[in-house]
């Protein structure tokens, strides 16, 4: 019985990971600049975290059945983290949208996005 419980828990974790959406924030800044990150939705808060140069942070989450899942993020860098940008880091567009992984890269000249679909379409 204990083995069955463990198997069920592992199965739910794997299925949740496979079917979930997510955000990836990567630090591609130069000159050893650290990246401060904080993201939030209606129900969750991620961070604040410090991402080292060349580092990244993955956050996977399930979307709601009403297709209203949205995450907002703030990234800060520079002396005393004075330079900052607020943006919508994840948003569903319809009930049939699974979201995929929104891959953000912070660079010296801006913040760049690549959306990776979960169904093998890039």
Swiss-Prot record:
It is found in: Secreted. Residues 1-20 form the signal peptide. Glycans are attached at residue 86. It comes from Arabidopsis thaliana. Pfam families: Self-incomp_S1. One of its GO terms (cellular component) is extracellular region. GO terms for biological process: rejection of self pollen. The keyword Plastid does not apply. It comes from the Eukaryota. This is S-protein homolog 23. PANTHER family: PTHR31232, S-PROTEIN HOMOLOG-RELATED (PTHR31232:SF54). Keywords: Glycoprotein, Secreted, Self-incompatibility, Signal. Belongs to the plant self-incompatibility (S1) protein family. The gene is SPH23.
